[in-house]
Amino acid sequence: MTDSAKNPVSVSIIGGSGYTGAELMRLIAKHPHFRLFQVVANRNAGKKVEDIFPHLRHLNLPDFITFEEMNFDGIGLIFCALPHATSQEIIIKIPDGMKIIDLSADFRLESIEEYERWYGQKHIAHSLQEKAVYGLTEIYQKKIKKGSLIACTGCNSAATLYPILPLLKEGVITNDNLTINLGAGVSGAGRDAKQNIIHAEVSEGVKPYNVGKHRHIAELEQEFKKASNKKIDITFIPHLLPQNRGVIVSIPLSLPASLVHKTLEIFYEDSPFIIILPIEEVPATQHVRGSNFCHIGVVSDYNKNRSVVISVLDNLIKGSAGQAIQNANIMFDFCETSGLLESPIFP
């Protein structure tokens, strides 16, 4: 038995009553190296986890507490799963020296001005922003390993960046504009009641939303520029899908499929959670549901000098809680796949 199994890292979750918080609890409960010590959910403080999430009843999790009730002694890691703006207000109150993985948007953007422009909120934690590491695991693994504040990516951003960043880094994509078509399940909008995501509004139809002004554009612009050393103009067309989970991205490219496929295969050959499908095979969201895997497919256009790259992931796992656990594994020098090798749920 390893030392970490005998003496697991004590972790806490701040923001345990949302979908991401629930998935963090589920994943941590069966993780070989982490022990869930406390879960903060101010609105539900004093309640048992099973009162809010009956499906977690069997896990014997700690009751919800308030942030003021937190005990920081002996904590090795904090996951913060609060909404943007709220997250930074809480994180600045956490004692110095704590390792933190933040799942909000508050520390993803390197530019404070860009954050305030896209999110309409004042950024109040400039010193923390300066040391934050963008948490796209397979791209920034070395920085994540040394980091103390990891800013997990947006789910839509992750699904887009995984197929495109290698092509930019390797100089395969040379044009300065990209069109990104995306479909996302309703859980990406969070757990709070909103008219536009209730069953009667979403089922039996697909509709675009936030076309040209989705906040994840800021992340994409930032990361595309870092990978290519130039500004890439983005046309981003997200659609709300009548399903709970999943993100699917399709991006047309003026490149032959064989070149795109080979580049991605080589780039991700040592990445256990990024699966490059056989060329011409199309990925589907149901094939990654409930898992930490991202499937990427490359298909030829009728014009052989063009292709389409398609990626899928589960927004709550690889796009959020699973990504956070994977980053935590790297921070503590555990096996990258620890606690994350569950197969997708199908059908």
Identify what each model region corresponds to.
Residues 2-204, 209-211, 229, 299-302, ...:
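N-terminal Rossmann-like NAD(P) cofactor-binding subdomain of oxidoreductases
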Residues 197-293:
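Contiguous C-terminal substrate-recognition/catalytic subdomains in enzyme active sites
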Residues 8, 133, 177, 233, ...:
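A residue-level signal for beta-strand positions that form part of recognition/binding surfaces
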Residues 40, 65, 137, 181, ...:
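Residues in well-ordered beta-strands of folded domains
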Residues 25, 161-165, 217-221, 265, ...:
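Predominant activation on well-ordered alpha-helical scaffold segments within soluble catalytic domains
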Residues 18, 84, 130, 157-161, ...:
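Electropositive phosphate-/nucleotide-binding environments in soluble metabolic enzymes
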